[in-house]
Amino acid sequence: MMLPLLAVSAFASLGAAQTYTSCNPTNSLKTWSLSTDFTQGSSDGWTAISGNVTYGSNGAEFTINKRYDAPTLETNFYIFFGEVEVVMRAANGTGIVSSIVMESDDLDEIDWECTGTDTTQIQTNYFGKGNTTTYDRAIWETVSSPQDEFHTYKVVWTAAAITWYIDGTAVRTLEYADAVDGKNYPQTPMVVKLGIWAGGDPSNSEGTIEWAGGETDYDEVPFTMYVKSVNIINYNPAASYNYTDKTGSYTSIVASNSTTGSGIHSSNSVSVFAPSSSTSTFTSSRALIATASTYPASVQTSSSGVVSLSSSSASSSSAAASSTSGSASAVFTGAAVTNLPSFFFTVFFALAIALAF
């Protein structure tokens, strides 16, 4: 999407999503999935960050009634690799853009955008770390009458690839290596945004207006986008995600306080589960790589992992973790960490006695 920041803040929520973030990845989806049926009304998992969103038999209604309207919903949580499936009917109207946006605080972004006068296509796009040096990432995919019919738009996002689906059919795949060897690959925790905005507003640049299909005539309002439902799966549920450096790499992200049964797996398929009474963190040189083929049975990661569990109830994980091989630099169970001071005390005490004699 990646457009210049507009003068009106209402447009900024989606029209310039890359220029705005809340910088607070401490709220995350702590369960595997969240399903929202907007035909039943609003949901606690979402917040209207701009404008007024109403609800009816067609689900959430995002309506432009006048200039500067840009109603937008945003999730109250982040996901760190996963799936986002939206059942949407795009809005009609010249210059009107219906958007499904996944966006991170590090300015990574994965998009669907449908303009109001293009009755045969929808745009797929992505950005990494706010890089706008080129605008050659967008690909338009065929879809039938998106303004008149509901279609299911889905993104499956892993550390290896992003795949866009329309009505169950894969239409585009982006491999990690194909995004400047990962440099421009979206890979940090994201929120999901749904909304409508006027790309054809006369205050926008000529290029933006042309891309949106022409200048918007506000005498033709209302323009309404509908979303019936959203299904979100988080491959790495946690209480929070912490950036440990400024690289913007997924390998630098620490998922803290993973939920019970989240099942983070190492490359040799040894499971490490975080009990509900414990806290856990997981970091890896190739951390948190999830694949659609293995989810939800496991979230696959490669080797060189470091796992810490701060609870004696983690003993069931101790034996499994101790068998981890490959290039793993260290593996500590809760029991090992807890007993470490007494272990060193015993060793030094024995050494002192030996030296005394």
Swiss-Prot record:
Known catalytic reactions: Random endo-hydrolysis of N-acetyl-beta-D-glucosaminide (1->4)-beta-linkages in chitin and chitodextrins
Active site positions, chain numbering: 109 (nucleophile), 113 (proton donor)
Range of residues in the leader sequence: 1-17
EC number(s) from the headed UniProt entry: 3.2.1.14, 2.4.-.-
Maturation propeptide residues: 327-357
One of the record's GO molecular function terms: hydrolase activity, hydrolyzing O-glycosyl compounds
Superkingdom, natural source: Eukaryota
SUPFAM superfamilies to which the protein is assigned, alphabetical: Concanavalin A-like lectins/glucanases
Residue ranges crossing the lipid bilayer per the database entry: 337-357
Protein's UniProt keywords contain Transferase: yes
Residues anchoring lipid (GPI-anchor amidated glycine): 326
Cross-referenced InterPro entries: ConA-like_dom_sf, GH16, Glyco_hydro_16_CRH1_prd, Glycosyl_Hydrlase_16
Annotated chitin binding sites: 113, 193, 197, 208
Recorded GO CC terms: plasma membrane; side of membrane
Membrane topology according to the record: Lipid-anchor; GPI-anchor
Function noted in UniProt: Dual chitinase/transglycosylase that plays a role in cell wall architecture. Chitinase and transglycosylase activities are coupled. Required for the polysaccharide cross-linking at the septa and the cell wall. More specifically, transfers chitin to 1,6-beta-glucan in the cell wall.
Family statement: Belongs to the glycosyl hydrolase 16 family. CRH1 subfamily.
UniProt name for this protein: Crh-like protein 1
Organism: Aspergillus fumigatus (strain ATCC MYA-4609 / CBS 101355 / FGSC A1100 / Af293)
Taxonomic lineage from the root: Eukaryota, Fungi, Dikarya, Ascomycota, Pezizomycotina
